[in-house]
Every structure is written in structure tokens, then in C-alpha cells.
Amino acid sequence: MILCCGESLIDMIPEQTVKDKNGFVPYPGGAIFNTAIGIGRLKCRVGLMSGISTDIFGQQLMAELSASNVDTSNAILSDRPTTLAFVQLTDGQASYLFYDENSAGRMITVEDMPHRLDDVTAFLFGGISLHCCLLYTSDAADEE
């Protein structure tokens, strides 16, 4: 199995509402989340290790993973909020405003990491996840 390690979040995409008001529509996202979804849809064995909230947005993330054949057994569930990324589109270019302080994805600890990864044949790390995963790898090496 390929284990994707990184962020899962909700992209808040600007769209006009039915009454021509500006609003934001929530879409599951995050670079590593999207990669896991794509791999799962190709019917390859893939899992996601990410901090995911149990709030309504986290439920949306988990539903998308399940519908796309992504193993969620290494998801780190938390009652902390889901990271939100508000997207601003200017001339087709996206910029982001993140709300992620104390979120499920940012508050992962070494103790949250899985201890058995026998079925993992490859890892894919996102940049945001490397800090926590490096701590995990360092601790695992110390145990050997």
C-alpha cells in the first residue's frame, strides 16, 4: 500500500449564490489528500495518514476518502476543528488564507503515529507533514 502522509482540509471556494451574493462553498482538499484520492480512484492500494476532525467538515473528508477507495485506518481522528483554506482567485491565480491554529491536522503528536506499517510499500509525504513525521522516524530509529 502507498501511504500518503499530509494535510486534509476544506477549501472554501468563492462562488455566487442563487441570489447573486458572494459566498464560499466547501470542497475537500489538501495536496496529499487530493493525491490519495487520485491514487484510490485508479484502484491502487492507498491509505492516508492525516489528522482529521470529527466535525462536519471532517465527516465530509472521510466520506470522500471512503468513496474513492482510500484506506483510512491510519487517519488520526480528533475533536479539534478542520483546517479551512479560503481561496481567493485573481486572474486565474489562487491565493489562500488558512485557518488552522489548533486544528486536527496541526496538533498531531508522535504518540498519534501508527506503530505497525507492515503493509506499506511506499510513503508519500507532503511538506507540512514532514516535521511531525521526522520526529516519528527519529524516535523509531532510537528504539532500534
Regions found by a protein language model. Give the residues of each.
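Single conserved hydrophobic/aromatic residue that forms the stacking wall/gate
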Residues: 136-144
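Anionic group-transfer/hydrolysis microenvironments
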Residues: 9, 13, 128, 141
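Ser/Thr-centric signal marking residues that sit
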Residues: 35, 82, 137
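Conserved N-terminal subdomain of the carbohydrate kinase-like
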Residues: 45-128
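Short amphipathic alpha-helices and their capping/turn segments at secondary-structure boundaries
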Residues: 1, 112-115, 138
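Glycine/threonine-rich flexible loop motifs
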Residues: 130-135
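Glycine-rich phosphate/adenosyl-contacting loop at the front of the ribokinase-like
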Residues: 1-70
